Every structure is written in C-alpha cells, then in structure tokens.
C-alpha cells in the first residue's frame, strides 16, 4: 500500500515460519515498485470489497476485515512507513545510481507516506 507495485495479484503472498509460534504472513513479498507516472497508485487486489485505490482512509476503514482494531492497524501502518523511508539508503547500498533512485521516488514518497509517519 505504501509502495506502488505493478505485480499486485492474489498469488503474491508469502509466509514466514516463526518457530514454535507457527506461520505468519510476510510483511512484504515480491514487490515491483513503479513510478506513479507509469501506473497510478491503484491496486489490482481491492483493499475492501469495492475499492483498490491506495488510501490510508480506506485501509483504516477495512482494518476490521483483517481482525485488527484501528489502533493496531495504525501501529502496523506506522511501522511499515518507517521502514519504507529507508528505501533510498537501501537502493544506494545495492548500487542504484542517483538518477535511478530519483526516477523511482514517486513509488515510495507520497502524501500517504507522510501521513502514515505522523500516526
């Protein structure tokens, strides 16, 4: 939701084995970020029953579908947002050039990220 993803479909989910705690849904799996001038921030898989637009309001409203209270959902959103802000450093660390990083910025940096960080 906070990173645009051109490869968004129902079979793109992964699980992590947490030892005796069992399996957990992976927080991120097979993301293919794309700048917003190439693809709008709209998901192929809807957030609720009717809508796929990337929106924190919609995500918060749908939190109950996932067994989360609003407070729990907001804590997760903020955690994901905090990690998302490290994308530039991560890209540099793996050898991305400044021009490539700047080209991809809109896939990561947008108003929803700013709002998520403020939760």
For each predicted feature, which ranges?
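Anionic ligand-binding catalytic core segments
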Residues: 1-10, 14-119
């Amino acid at each position: 939701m906070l990173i645009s993803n051109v490869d968004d479909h129902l079979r793109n989910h992964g699980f992590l084995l947490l030892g005796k705690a069992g399996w957990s849904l992976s927080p991120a799996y097979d993301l293919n970020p794309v700048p917003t001038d190439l693809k709008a921030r709209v998901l192929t898989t809807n957030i609720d029953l009717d809508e796929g637009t990337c929106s924190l309001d919609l995500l918060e409203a749908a939190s109950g579908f996932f067994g989360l209270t609003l407070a729990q959902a907001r804590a997760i959103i903020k955690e994901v947002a905090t990690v998302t802000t490290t994308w530039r450093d991560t890209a540099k660390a793996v050898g991305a050039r400044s021009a490539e990083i700047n080209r991809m910025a809109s896939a990561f940096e947008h108003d929803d990220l700013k709002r998520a960080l403020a939760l």
